[in-house]
Design a protein with these regions (language model features):
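Cell-envelope/extracellular polymer assembly enzymes that use nucleotide-activated donors
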Residues: 3-5, 37
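Short, well-formed alpha-helical segments that are part of the catalytic scaffolds
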Residues: 13-29
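Short beta-strand/loop segment that forms part of the nucleotide-sugar
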Residues: 32-45, 67-68
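A conserved acidic beta->alpha catalytic loop
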Residues: 42-51, 98
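Glycine-rich, basic loop-to-helix element that forms the pyrophosphate-binding segment
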Residues: 52, 69-86, 106-107
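Short aromatic/hydrophobic "clamp" motif used to bind/position activated sugar donors
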Residues: 91
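Conserved donor-nucleotide/metal-binding helix-loop-beta segment in metal-dependent transferases, i.e.
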Residues: 105-118
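Conserved small/polar residues in nucleotide/adenosyl-binding loops
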Residues: 121-123
Length: 123
């Protein structure tokens, strides 16, 4: 079974991140031969308890890891921090607000399996 590491920078995402994670998990249930892990990075969210929600997800699901950056370093730095904790065969970056809908994941993985180093979906 191949493992896909889903890395998601999170900023003021307390109200949205659970839905994103659980929708992605539902998509993986439809795909044979794959499982996933999540590396969620709170990028210093000042307005809500994003990291608290990430910790709850980590307690509920064994495939969820959380990182807490003490201040906002920006999306790219949050992604780089996440990469140090991935263990998957492939890495898939997503946004915390579903700019790439979880239903598109199978298309991205298919392209990665074809050998592409970078896969993008234009919606």
């Amino acid at each position: 079974m191949k493992r896909i590491s889903i890395v998601i920078p999170c900023y003021n995402s307390e109200a949205t991140i659970r839905k994103v994670v659980e929708m992605v998990m539902e998509e993986f249930k439809k795909m044979d031969g794959y499982d996933c892990e999540f590396v969620l990075v709170n990028d210093g969210s000042p307005k809500d308890d994003t990291y608290g929600e990430i910790k709850k997800l980590g307690e509920q699901y064994k495939n969820v890891k959380g990182i807490n950056l003490l201040r906002n370093f920006g999306q790219h730095n949050a992604l780089m921090a996440a990469l140090h904790y991935t263990e998957g065969d492939f890495i898939l970056g997503m946004d915390d607000d579903m700019q790439t809908h979880p239903s598109q994941i199978s298309k991205l993985i298919h392209k990665m399996e074809e050998g592409y180093d970078l896969s993008l979906i234009h919606i």
